[in-house]
Amino acid sequence: MADLKTNLLGFVMNSPIIGASGTVGYGVEYEELADFSRIGGISGKGLTLHGQYGNKGERLWETPSGLINSIGLQNPGVQHFIDVELNEMLELRQKYGTVVIANLGGHSEEEYVEGAAMLSDSAVDIVELNISCPNVKVGGMAYGVKAEAAGEVVRMVRDACKKPLMVKLSPQAENIPEMCKAIEAAGADAISLTNTFQACAIDLEKRKPVFNNIFAGLSGPAVRPIALRMVWQAVGAVNIPVVGLGGIATGRDALEFIMAGATAVQVGAANFANPRAMETIAEEMAAWMDKNGVKTLDEIRGCARSNG
């Protein structure tokens, strides 16, 4: 029988499947719905140093092949997470071996550093740094657009954080390979990509943009081939693990990312369509492996690179 166990930064996960931040709450919301023995880890709801109420107006808008969201990082803040939600995630770790990942955003270098330092002293396993947040000091441009700015914030967080550090990239980055190299040089232990793609929707009846901020984040099957291309580029640019995400909805989707060289994958929008998506994807991966005589993921990880 296929063995889906995956080593990510020294943590041996049940499978390469990680619940993507913002789509599974803190994991506990899914405990009665999903078989956590099939799930490798959970990246909790995106955090900021101080709690945020999130965006007003419409927050979700379905497209023919995806979902546009404008949540606005609604969250209770880092300290509240450490005091309350983290304890619930740690129960999942104790019961099922689920790797606990804290996703951290920020609106200034100082916020990133302070939040990372607090998480570093907590019981989380991995800190996932979301650098898609706007930098208020430079007119709101996301940290993840230019390699120099991204490298600088990662370097500062690295100095403050003793935990394994995974950096989540924006697809709006000017140059994915150069961005990955800058982040690796700044001390990142792993890279996850890609975050949502900027998108727009118009409400015909109201004759105005759906979202108050006009632009919002597109995820789902529509973005998968582009995300796969970016993962391919990232794997070729760095020597640290790459976690792939973007439109993964089936076992075959996940296996594409593994064959492109990803160490693990995250599942996001699919969880809204099917609360059991993560375990279903793991089961489909195992079934394909059994059918094709593949015993472990290491046998096929990156295989497409040598056959391309």
For the regions a language model picked out, list residue spans one by one.
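Surface-exposed amphipathic alpha-helices with a cationic face
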Residues: N7, F11, I82-K95, S120, ...
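N-terminal capping/small domains of soluble enzymes
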Residues: M1-V100, G106
